[in-house]
From Swiss-Prot:
Keywords: ATP-binding, Ligase, Metal-binding, Nucleotide-binding, Queuosine biosynthesis, Zinc
Pathway(s) of this molecule: Purine metabolism; 7-cyano-7-deazaguanine biosynthesis
Function as written in the Swiss-Prot or TrEMBL entry: Catalyzes the ATP-dependent conversion of 7-carboxy-7-deazaguanine (CDG) to 7-cyano-7-deazaguanine (preQ(0)).
Co-factor remark: Binds 1 zinc ion per subunit.
Annotated binding of Zn(2+), by residue: 187, 196, 199, 202
Protein name: 7-cyano-7-deazaguanine synthase
Organism of derivation: Vibrio campbellii (strain ATCC BAA-1116)
CDD domains linked: QueC-like
GN (gene name): queC
Pfam families: QueC
């Protein structure tokens, strides 16, 4: 039996990955992390979407310690989300160590249930400037976890080389575009669906959706070509 663990926030990217995983694996587990993020609604959205999609299990883990250590606009209500980069070249929504912790815990969970695949929706093409969304970071984490647990498994990143328009196309491939558009929470200001329309996350999401809806055939063809290249 092919099992997979999906790191699941209830946002556009991780929901698209979850929909795909449910088609490709026999048993899919979702794991969501409560790190004291800006909007608790994120946890509720993840629980509802996971239930509606019928995952084998959905585990919500309390990792509140991350909130104490990682100061960010996503972990502090008194820090407004900014469109500008900080002096270190990163957006103030970057949560240091978040994906290091998440992938480590997801790997441990996969070990316990006998899953050989961990799936995360990080993306280097349209990422927000986060260093822990890069392909070389994921490969390094994969290597470290395999060595540290002496177990072969793979961290898969289905969205790594897709732009946001192609991510929408991928959701549409699995007849999940409306689900992703209406039921997910990507907005930094905590508004489900199309969001506030003002924060950096909403800007990226809307630009990708508009691109896809206005150029469906071309975007879908680009997605299919990338999928073929990956399979070779």
């Amino acid at each position: 039996m092919k099992k997979a663990v999906v790191v699941f926030s209830g946002g556009q990217d991780s929901t698209t990955c979850l929909v795909q995983a449910l088609k490709e694996f026999d048993e899919v587990h979702a794991i969501t992390f409560d790190y004291g993020q800006r909007h608790k609604l994120e946890i509720e959205v993840a629980e509802k979407v996971a239930k509606d999609l019928g995952v084998a299990a959905h585990k919500v883990m309390d990792v509140g310690l991350l909130n104490e250590l990682a100061i960010s606009s996503l972990t502090r209500d008194d820090i407004p989300v900014s469109h500008e980069l900080q002096e270190n070249g990163l957006p103030n929504s970057f949560v240091p160590g978040r994906n290091i912790l998440f992938l480590t815990l997801a790997g441990i969970y996969a070990y316990q249930i006998g899953a050989e695949t961990v799936i995360t929706g990080v993306c280097e093409t349209d990422f927000s400037g986060y260093p822990d969304c890069r392909d070389d970071f994921v490969k390094a984490m994969n290597s470290a976890l395999v060595k540290g647990m002496d177990r072969q498994f793979e961290i898969k990143t289905p969205l790594m080389w897709l732009n946001k328009a192609e991510t929408w196309a991928l959701a549409d491939q699995y007849d999940a575009l409306q689900l992703v558009r209406e039921s997910t929470l990507t907005c930094y200001n905590g508004i489900i669906g199309d969001g506030c329309g003002d924060c950096p996350s909403c800007d990226l999401r809307k630009a990708g959706l508009d691109d896809y809806l206005n150029n469906k055939d071309a975007v879908m063809q680009s997605l299919i070509q990338k999928q073929k290249s990956e399979d070779q």
